[in-house]
Amino acid sequence: RKMDARVLDLCSGSGCIGCAIADALPQTRVVLSDVSPEAMDVSRHNVNRNGLEGRVSFMLADVTKAPPIMTGSFDLVVSNPPYIPTFDILTLDPSVRDYEPVWALDGGEDGLDFYRAILKNWKGVIRQGGMLMFEVGEDQAGDVKDLMRMAGLHDAQSIKDTRGVERVVTARA
């Protein structure tokens, strides 16, 4: 609820989540981060298109590696990482499978690789008492909450989408 919060959007892709946060909370500063230069270009376009320059910045970074930023820098970290299990990608609807690059979908054998990587490498960028929020795939909320608890985060909870599916998992540092 902190109005002047610093927010990090990991695996930001087009930047829609971070842009929505920046738009809804004008005092907030958002950093969009992705491993893909092409995704960062799309993010820049979306930031400019929505008049969010000056409040949203960009960081090219790989969540599977140590972060290039200081410990405790962010009040909120959000991420919609790749979460489709590798073997499920071929069964996706063509409108998804043929539109998105495979690396933007493939979450590893169980779909949880990026959650593990973010918790291992990036949880330290969240200030004490700050929050981590993940979008999760169907039937992944319980596993992701367990990973968060094992990583030392507290108050792991899930939020259901309009279909009643646990779609977002949150926890506090």
Language model features by range: what are they?
Residues I21, V96, I118-W122:
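Class I S-adenosylmethionine-dependent transferase superfamily signal
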Residues R1-T91:
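Conserved SAM/SAH cofactor-binding pocket of Class I
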Residues D9-G18, A61, P82, G107-G111, ...:
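Glycine-centered flexibility sites
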Residues E109-R172:
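Conserved Class I SAM-dependent methyltransferase catalytic core
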Residues Y83-D113:
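Mobile active-site "lid"/loop adjacent to the S-adenosyl-L-methionine
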Residues Y83, R172-A173:
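C-terminal beta-strand of the catalytic ATP-binding
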Residues S57-M59, W103, Q157:
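Structural signal for short hydrophobic segments within the conserved structured cores
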Residues N80, Y99, E135:
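Alpha/beta-hydrolase-fold catalytic nucleophile elbow
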